[in-house]
Amino acid sequence: IKLSEEMDMIIKNLLWYIPNIDSFQATKNELISDRIYDEFSFTYIMEQMGMKESRDVRWIGQKEVISKEDWEFFEGEICTNCQKILVAKYSTLSKINTLLTTIRNSIAHGHFAIVEDYIIGFNLKLSSKDPEGLRKAIIKIKPKPLLSALEKLASPMGKELLLAYAFRRVGYDVQEPKNRSRDFDLCLEKNGKKYVTEIKSYRGNTY
């Protein structure tokens, strides 16, 4: 595959550097791996990518496989009008970790293609029961906004960003203070009542 310089860097990041994957270079990020953040983190990333989980993502059980018809459809035609994710959800991984691991595996095994600004990847799980492999995931996305969203969550202000997003999702008006060293981390208002939030680390965990 002949890639542009930008797409070449994107593929390398997806293969080696995205958080929490099985790679020596990968960093750890609790906002991506911890179940307590999972729903808001995944929804945030979907929005940043211009996707909706209810419309564009189909989860299947970890013992299920993607139908041969769906697999052959995505292998045969690459539409660049929409992004889609079909993936087996494992109980040991968060939604984001499932997505990132799937993308990384499809690249590592060479079962992917680049069309314009899309990557489409396929994830087959080796099995003695099926010599062709078990069809576990199809990913057709624009990787650049995915990496941008991950970078924001991994930034020093990632926790504040995600908490502000979560509070807005449940109806709070969120104001970020002008002076964080002196004020609280977030100022909230809902139904005429005002609240303040301060984020603290305790024994390695953030609250």
Placement of each model-derived feature along the sequence:
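Acidic-basic catalytic patches of nuclease active cores, encompassing PD-(D/E)XK
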Residues: 154-178
